[in-house]
Amino acid sequence: MALEQAGTLTADSFRRGVFIGTGIGGIATLEEQILIRHEKGSRRVSPFMVPMMMPNAAPAAVSMRHGFQGPAENTCTACAAGTHALANAARLIAHGRCDVVLAGGSEAPFVETAIAGFTNMTAFSSVGISRPFDAERDGFVMGEGAGIMLLEEWDMAVERGATILAEILGGASTADAHHITAPSPGRSEEHTSELQSHHNLVCRRLLEKKK
């Protein structure tokens, strides 16, 4: 759908990239093949198991299907993977490596082992409602799906008459070196300031460019 909406691309195939994030990767394939090995023996495990379960299989498959011969990369950073992929894709364009990048995230974690793991860590909402920004939030609801955007260098998009839906001004990420899932108490302001500093820098550069 992203390619269809974008229309005819003019960028060289070597300057077209793919950046797709996933939190887990091919966990369904892994569980399936573990059961096969347990029930039927090691020789029945699929030779395609490894390439099917690798997190970077998604961008690789997309690049092969559409002939994108630039970077085909993956971020595997849990729930932030798709957003990180968008930020990294935007950097590929901002730094002059790519003119076009398909970017986003994909996840399909509906297997018994994943469900059991999230259940036992009490990560699921007890009321069955996912509301991450609500003060009364109590967990998430597992789902599967994908979201992909086509990012393009601004001048190239304007020149070919593309319908521009949004502009990414910048992005930043930090680690609070505290806990694998829980945020560090009292440090959110410092981490937010990193993004704000980057955003201000990008805005200044845009204003200078327009003068």
Language-model segments: residues:
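Conserved active-site "lid/cap" helical segment
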Residues: 1-16, 193, 197
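Conserved catalytic cysteine-centered active-site region
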Residues: 15, 25-88, 97, 117-142, ...
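A short acidic, glycine/proline-enriched capping/turn motif at secondary-structure boundaries
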Residues: 2, 18, 23-27
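Condensing-enzyme catalytic core mediating Claisen C-C bond formation in acyl metabolism
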Residues: 128-189, 193
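Short glycine-aspartate micro-motif
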Residues: 15-19, 99-103, 165
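Short acidic, glycine/serine/threonine-rich loops at helix termini
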Residues: 29-32, 111-117, 178-181
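Positively charged, low-complexity/disordered segments
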Residues: 194-211
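Acidic, glycine-rich active-site loops and adjacent beta-strand->loop/helix elements
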Residues: 22-25, 77-81, 105-110, 170-175
